[in-house]
Amino acid sequence: MYVMTQSGWLELICGCMFSGKSEELIRRVRRAQFAKQEVKVFKPTIDNRYSEDAVVSHNGNSVIAIPVATPAEMFRYISAATDVVAIDEIQFFSDDIIDVVQTLADCGYRVIAAGLDQDFRGEPFGPVPALMAIAESVTKLQAVCTVCGSPASRTQRLINGAPASYDDPVILVGASEAYEPRCRHHHEVPGKPKKRYNHPLAGHTGE
C-alpha cells in the first residue's frame, strides 16, 4: 500500500456479522490513541446491544463512543484538534452519512468506518456500497460458517431458530441469539425472489 502524503481519507471495514469488524475498528482506534492522536468515536443510537455509549466487539473489547441519531450530529463533537473520526455500525445511518464522511475526509480527517456490507437478505446494506466506492482503503472481513466451517460472507437471521423471511424488516438489531454467519451456500432466505438467470452449469460442484 502506498504511503499517504496528504491527510484526510476514508478507511472502510466491512463484512458479515461476527467477522471482527468492530474488533478491527477498536484496534485502529487504540493504535491512534497510543500515537497521542485525538480520536472521536461514534455509533448510531439504534445500536444498544451491549452498551449505549461504547463500541463493544463480540470478544468483549470496547472503546467509549458517542451515540448519535443522525450523521450531522457528529459535527457538534468534532473540532480542529480532532485527528481521527471512527464510526461503527455505519450501515444504520441514512445516506447523509456519505456526505458527512466525504466532508470530513476532504477537511483532512482520517475517517475509520465499520459496518455490514450486506443485510440479512444478502443484499447491499444502506450507504455501505457507496462508501466502499469512495473509500481509499476497504478491508472486507469474513467469519466462519456455522454450518460447514467455510469462510462466511453473509449474515443469517434466525427467528425462533428458523431462517427469517425475505419480507421481514431489514433493520432488527440483535446479537448471537438472532444472527449467525453463513457461507453463500448455507445462507437461507425463504421468499427471496428467484434469480433472473438459470445457469446451464447450475449442477456444477466446483470440484
Swiss-Prot record:
Q: Which GO terms describe its molecular function?
A: ATP binding; thymidine kinase activity; zinc ion binding
Q: Which InterPro entries match?
A: P-loop_NTPase (IPR027417), Thymidine_kinase (IPR001267), Thymidine_kinase_CS (IPR020633)
At which positions is Zn(2+) bound? 145, 148, 183, 186
Q: Which UniProt keywords apply?
A: ATP-binding, Cytoplasm, DNA synthesis, Kinase, Metal-binding, Nucleotide-binding, Transferase, Zinc
Asked if the record carries the keyword Amino-acid biosynthesis, the reply is no
> Which reactions does this protein catalyse?
thymidine + ATP = dTMP + ADP + H(+)
Q: Where is this region: Disordered?
A: 184-207
- The UniProt record lists the EC number as 2.7.1.21
Amino acid composition bias (Basic residues), ranges on this chain: 184-198
Residues that bind ATP: 15-22, 88-91
* Pfam family of the protein (one): TK
* Localization of this protein: Cytoplasm
Gene3D superfamilies, sorted: 3.30.60.20, P-loop containing nucleotide triphosphate hydrolases (3.40.50.300)
User: Which EC class is this protein assigned?
Assistant: transferase
Where does the UniProt entry say this protein principally localizes? cytoplasm
Q: What GO terms fall under cellular component here?
A: cytosol
- One biological-process term from Gene Ontology? DNA biosynthetic process
The record places the active site at 89 (proton acceptor)
The entry assigns this protein to a family as follows:
Belongs to the thymidine kinase family.
User: What PANTHER family does UniProt report for this protein, alphabetically?
Assistant: THYMIDINE KINASE (PTHR11441), THYMIDINE KINASE, CYTOSOLIC (PTHR11441:SF0)
What does the record note on quaternary structure? Answer: Homotetramer.
Q: What is this protein called?
A: Thymidine kinase
